[in-house]
Structures are given as C-alpha cells and as structure tokens.
Amino acid sequence: TTVLDKSFRLPNKIANFAKSIVKRIDRRYEKEWSSRDDEGLLEYHTKFDYINMSKGEWLVLARTHYLLQPIEAQCRREGWFYSKNNVPSVRKSLITSIQDWEKLRKGESISSAAVRKMYQFFKSDGNVTKKGRGLKNVTEYETFSLQNLQNDYGLRTSGIWHEAFDNLSIYEREYMIALLRRGEKLTEEPRVRLSTIHAAKGKECQHVVLLTDLSRKAWTQMQVHENDELRTFYV
C-alpha cells in the first residue's frame, strides 16, 4: 500500500490549520504529509457580515442546518446566487420562463410546453384570464407568439417580467431583481454553496468559510466525545 505524503489541494496555511485540529485527537495514528508549495490565505472573522462574497466561488460550511439560516438571509439581501444543501435559491422553471417571456417580447415564438410552464407565474384572472390559463385544445407541437397568446389565450400584459409575472411573491420578485442587477449568472451553477460539514465531504472550492459555532446539543456531546467533533471539523 502506498501512502501519499503530499496534498496537492491544501496550501500551507490551510494545512497547518487542519493539523492544529487533528493533533488534539487522542489515540490517532500519526500520518506524515506536506501541503502544496504556496502559502494560501487564512483569515479569522468574528462576524459573517465582514466577509465579502460578491465575487468568486464560495463554500460555506456549518456544523448543523440552522446555523446556515442567517447566512442564507444575507445572501438574499445581497443578491447573491446560492444553493443550500444542493437546492438552488431560484427555481429553474422561473429562470427559463423569464427567458421565454423576453423572447415573446422580442417578437419570437415559444413552444406550448414553455407557455404552460410560464403561465404558472400569472395569476388566474390577473394578467391572464382563468379560461385562457387552461390552454385547452393546445397540442405539444404548436408554437405561440405574444400576439397569439393575447388574442386567443387570455394574456393581458406585455410588460417586463417582474410586472407581468403577478403570481410571484414580492419576496421572490425582489430577490430575482437583485440577482440580475448584480449580474449573477443564473444559467450556471450557483457560485455560493451553503452546506453542512457532513454533506460537503470531499467537495472543493476557491474560497471556503468554516463556521465554528456549535449547537447546544453538539457542544454537550463534545464534552463527552471530543474526538468525534474534532474529526468532523478536520474532515
């Protein structure tokens, strides 16, 4: 068996931080290994607000789910595109429907499947009539222009998406507007990922934020089984 003695992922400062955790574990077989050649960057912050995640890829790790809640709230306030436990902060169907709506406004046509998906974001008897919303007798092979939908399928608007989609909550609408103003790339994977430590095992990222807070339950367990908690943070 060959034991690799060099990490090509961890820069020196991060490796030293990891070793400072693992050396506190009792009765552990000592493994000799070295880091990458570069130093890397390790910073300590007393508040999450001090971390600027407006650019680049980020992985935020917490011991338990509830510790991610205030981080998620800040991501929404700032207009950062994120995922929490692998679930994106914006529904893919909404992103696609906004793109399809803008196609209609430019004079293009879209499929009946795209129309059905898009119509869920209009209130029945709001910006589309109740009768038109049903799209009766429409086949999967048909395509529709904005004028078709206005003339025959109850559409009552041609405004920009955040005015037209009247079935969106204010909460979701304002967040989407903030994302677009920031220039977030919504057709790509979210650049900020929020995860528990356990769920993120093996993942890598350009920037990693490790929340060192513990729940009362985890703190109590640590008083009895400290090694288990140390292994969690080390991994």
Language model features with spans:
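The feature marks helicase ATPase cores and/or their adjacent C-terminal helical subdomains
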Residues: 1-235
